[in-house]
Amino acid sequence: MLVFWLDILGTAVFAVSGVLLAGKLRMDPFGVLVLGVVTAVGGGTIRDMALANGPVFWVKDPTDLVVAMITCVLTLLLVRQPRRLPKWVLPVLDAVGLAVFVGIGVNKAFAAGTGPLVAICMGVITGVGGGIIRDVLAREIPMILRTEIYATACIIGGIVHATAFYTFGMPLQQAMMLGMLISLAIRLAAIRWHLKLPAFILER
């Protein structure tokens, strides 16, 4: 039950982040809906296709798809001036969704019978996949390709999650919560103190 509600939370939060970005780019309602939905379900879709574990999650159970659509519509109706929102709103919402989806991705990979390395990779894909699709559609450089500490937070949280469960035998839900908190703390710290990774620069 906890995983279900966390999944709903992550879906809604990522949908909101997609809608807010669409609003900043002055997209029409259809563009808003597309950007919000792909942000919410994109990462999980890539994960399920990679695991080849039957139909993707929103085909088997459209709950996440419905939640994403409803969230998009409500955000579109209630947030009339996204350009006036504080700059930290979108990054913080994205960080929450990121942490939740990394944990869910690791859990689903373990449920599919994978080892810890693949589980970590699936967690990262679940966390960043929707954001990559969102940024590509919005013609922005995906966050994962910038010097922001983004994928790093996913990887470390995924490692903590997988290690706690696979190596130390911690119950899966507890390991998930631990990994999520680590991912969220790292990402929020990076946002708060503008922490970045060094850039790779080649001089001409």
Stretches with model-predicted labels:
Residues 69-108:
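Ordered, amphipathic secondary-structure segments that act as subunit-interaction surfaces
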Residues 170-204:
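Long hydrophobic alpha-helical segments typical of transmembrane helices together
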Residues 1-11, 56-70, 115-127:
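Structural signature of hydrophobic alpha-helical transmembrane segments
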Residues 1-41, 45-52:
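N-terminal topogenic module of multi-pass integral membrane proteins
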Residues 14, 35-43, 63, 67-71, ...:
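Alpha-helical transmembrane segments in multi-pass membrane proteins
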Residues 30-38, 61-65, 86-97, 122, ...:
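Cytoplasmic-side transmembrane-helix entry/capping segments in multi-pass membrane proteins
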Residues 15-25, 48, 74-87, 132-143, ...:
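C-terminal ends of transmembrane helices
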Residues 1-5, 49-59, 105-118, 163-174:
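Helix-coil boundary and interhelical linker segments in multi-pass alpha-helical membrane proteins
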